[in-house]
Amino acid sequence: MLDAYLVEIFDLLHAAYGPRHWWPAETPFEVCVGAILTQNTNWGNVEKAINNLKKEGLLSPEALRDVPADRLAETIRPAGYFNVKSVRLKDFVGYLWERHGGSLERMFAGEWRQLREELLRVRGIGPETADSILLYAGDKPTFVVDAYTRRLFAALGVVDPETGYEEVRSLFMTNLPPDVRLFNEYHALIVEHGKHHCRKRPRCDGCGLHLFCRTHAAERPAP
C-alpha cells in the first residue's frame, strides 16, 4: 500500500538525517518573506537578503508596506531577481493589509483551504510558495512539493517526472495523516536528501534508498 510505502521512505530518511528543524526563522512573518525570496535561488542567498532586511529594520508588515520599492529591491539583491521579488513582497503585504489588517494571526485564523485559494490569487505566489507559507508559518496540514520531491519520487517510481504539482501533493495528502509535524519533517528530509544524493546528476553512493531506486538500478552493472 502506498501509505505504508511513504511512511517507510520517511523512516529511512529520518534515520539517515535526523530531525531537520525547518523552517529557520525567528517569526512567522520571516517565514512568509523567505518563502517568496527563495523562489529560483538557494537558501544561502535568501539568508543574506533576510539579514539585510533585519539590518534595515524592514522585516515587518508595516515596514514592507511603507518602504519604497527601489530601496526594498536593493536590500534583497542577494536573493536574485530582486526587482521582481520586491514587487512580489509588496503584493503579498498589500494583500495582508487589505484582507487581514496586516495581521498574520488573523490571516491564519480562518479555514486554511480557503486561505490557500486566496494566497494563490496573489500575484507571484504559486502553489509551492502558498503551501510553504501555510505549513511553515501557519502550522497548517498541507504538503509542500518542490523539484526535490518530484525528482526523488520519480526515481522511486511513484510519479512521472512531469507529474503536475497538485497531483504530487495529492499523493501525500491522501496517503498520509494530516499531521503538521510529519509534513514539515518529511518535506525538509526530502530537501536534505536531494542536496546530498538525489541531485540532477545523482550521487548514489551511500544513499539509504538505493534498494527502492530505479535510477540506481538502471546504473548498477549487470551481474
What are these regions (language model features)?
Residues 2-222:
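Catalytic cores of DNA base-excision repair glycosylases
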